[in-house]
Amino acid sequence: MSAGDTLDKLVVFLAKRDGIDKLVKTFQYVSKLAHWAAESSSPGLAGRAKNWETSAGLSRKAFRTGRFLTGLNGLRRAPGEFGALAVLANAGEMVYFFFDHFTWLSRVGVLDAWLARRMSFISAFGESVGYVFFIAMDLIMIRRGLRQERKLLREGGKDKDKEVKKIRMDRVMRLMATAANVADLVIGIADIEPNPFCNHAVTLGISGLVSAWAGWYRNWPS
């Protein structure tokens, strides 16, 4: 691939809201790990890293303005083959992004600061519920794909090879989505039920980067 092709794809990637979000999310969690690593040895550097993390986190909330409409639109449509799973996944996503607006506004001083913790909890709860059901749906589809792939491989034929390739590409994308959702679920649990493992800076940092980089892969132009 030429440098021009890569630059063209980067421009397309960053033109998407999800593309910008994944880039800033990378900044957010790299700076979290940098803060943790420098906290004891270089407090000044750690403070700068913390400021970068905070700024990136607030910027991502601003980028997500109106994103709850995606979940609302999903609820408006027929639930399809997944039925209740799809309804609960979209409802959780809608709650997450809707209350995230209030978390953002309270943290930047537009609303009372005491609201931030409460709104963050509600948002994280909705987020976690949504991720559980999105993960379940992706795992169901991966299982179906594996069964279909085995069937096609038994039958053989050139046309079947194309279908198998398509199934495998879909599986990779769903595995990436599952990895991102599991990582984000860990971050959500840290907000809902703080504990030493989920709330450790390394756990949060690695989880955030796994989610961000899986998103890079899924959204990168083909």
UniProtKB/Swiss-Prot annotation:
Induction: By abscisic acid, H(2)O(2) and nitrogen deprivation. Down-regulated by salt stress. Keywords: Membrane, Peroxisome, Peroxisome biogenesis, Transmembrane, Transmembrane helix. Expressed in seedlings, shoots, leaf sheaths and flag leaf. It is a multi-pass membrane protein. GO terms for molecular function: identical protein binding. Residues 103-196 are lumenal. Disulfide bonds: none annotated. GO terms for cellular component: peroxisomal membrane. GO terms for biological process: peroxisome fission; regulation of peroxisome size. InterPro entries: PEX11. It is found in: Peroxisome membrane. Belongs to the peroxin-11 family. This is Peroxisomal membrane protein 11-4. The gene is PEX11-4.
